[in-house]
Design a protein with these regions (language model features):
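Alpha-helical membrane-protein topology signature
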Residues: 1-179
Length: 179
């Protein structure tokens, strides 16, 4: 079962990386929904292998999959205010579900990471989103280490490096344009 758990995690990482190569926001959200569902399965299997803190990862990935589906369904009629309200509602849902599945302080790492990611989705400025990703990735990475989530660790490391690279590249381009 450990092999299957890790396979789902690595598959989720591949879907995550691939999602950002897709053309439309809607396609990205569908891919992220699949990614969250694969990570949900990954953490469920890790939980069944004895990683008791993996329950929080499983549950919070379920909340994120639901969040992404809601964003897809409301995409055309969503205002900026509605996006903010959804971010607050899903941040509260992450906190509540995180508290309900709490098994140790390790759970707090993933709760923080997922709240930061949920807030990031409501910010239209790409470099600010990248900063939130860089802040949340170490929390999720540490959670993944404690739960032996190979796919999760790879995903967070690549996400952090990708966000950092883009942040520095676009920041530098902005300075060159201003000069």
């Amino acid at each position: 079962m450990e092999f299957a758990a890790q396979a789902f995690g690595i598959l989720a990482f591949i879907v995550s990386v691939t999602s950002f190569q897709l053309k439309t926001y809607r396609q990205i959200l569908w891919a992220q929904t699949l990614c969250a569902t694969l990570f949900l399965t990954h953490f469920l299997l890790l939980y069944r292998c004895g990683q008791t803190d993996a329950m929080t990862g499983m549950a919070l990935n379920g909340v994120c999959a639901l969040r992404d589906v809601v964003l897809i369904l409301t995409e055309k009629k969503r205002t900026q205010q509605m996006t903010r309200l959804l971010a607050v509602a899903f941040s509260l849902a992450v906190a509540l579900v995180g508290i309900l599945t709490w098994t140790s302080p390790v759970s707090l790492l993933f709760i923080i990471a997922m709240i930061l990611n949920t807030v990031a989705m409501s910010i239209p400025e790409p470099n600010t989103v990248r900063v939130f990703i860089m802040i949340s990735a170490p929390f999720a990475f540490a959670y993944d280490v404690f739960n032996h989530s190979i796919g999760g660790m790879i995903n967070e490391a690549v996400s952090f490096l990708s966000a950092l690279t883009a942040f520095l590249r676009y920041r530098r381009k902005g300075k060159e344009t201003a000069a």
